[in-house]
Amino acid sequence: MPTNQQLIRKARQRLESGTKSPALRGCPQRRGVCTRVYTTTPKKPNSALRKVARVRLTSKFEVTAYIPGIGHNLQEHSVVLVRGGRVKDLPGVRYHIVRGALDAVGVKDRKKGRSSALQSIVATRIIATIPYQLF
């Protein structure tokens, strides 16, 4: 315990809290290439096969990122956008893959979590990606 005189001479150092997503290097998202896509099991009280991918980012980090939603089209060499955000029951998974950006398509037939304005945008985007031979 320092004395008052010691504190006057040299003030207490502020504790700097480290970032929870160091691989993003202060950016909101980073682009990366999937090196491995696989499933893993969560921690003790939960039971499932969670879909995750090992991603090599443009910042030269290789991270494990969670693939949210039901079903995905990702495979090795897919280019994805990675954001921060951990998965509580998967140790070591501190990043999420952004659905609907780059090679990761949005969740098929998603009903919830869409405003009426966004529904029309998503519908036109889906129609725009369908080749003309199908019409």
Curated annotation (Swiss-Prot):
Matches recorded under InterPro entries: NA-bd_OB-fold, Ribosomal_uS12, Ribosomal_uS12_bac
Subunit structure: Part of the 30S ribosomal subunit.
Compartments it resides in: Plastid, Chloroplast
Keywords: Chloroplast, Plastid, Ribonucleoprotein, Ribosomal protein, RNA-binding, rRNA-binding
The name this protein goes by in its record: Small ribosomal subunit protein uS12c
Record-annotated disulphide pairs: none
Protein family (similarity comment): Belongs to the universal ribosomal protein uS12 family.
Function: With S4 and S5 plays an important role in translational accuracy. Located at the interface of the 30S and 50S subunits.
UniProt-listed Pfam families: Ribosom_S12_S23
GO biological process: translation
Cellular-component GO terms for this entry: chloroplast; small ribosomal subunit
GO molecular function, one term: rRNA binding
Domain of life assignment: Eukaryota
Chief location bin: plastid
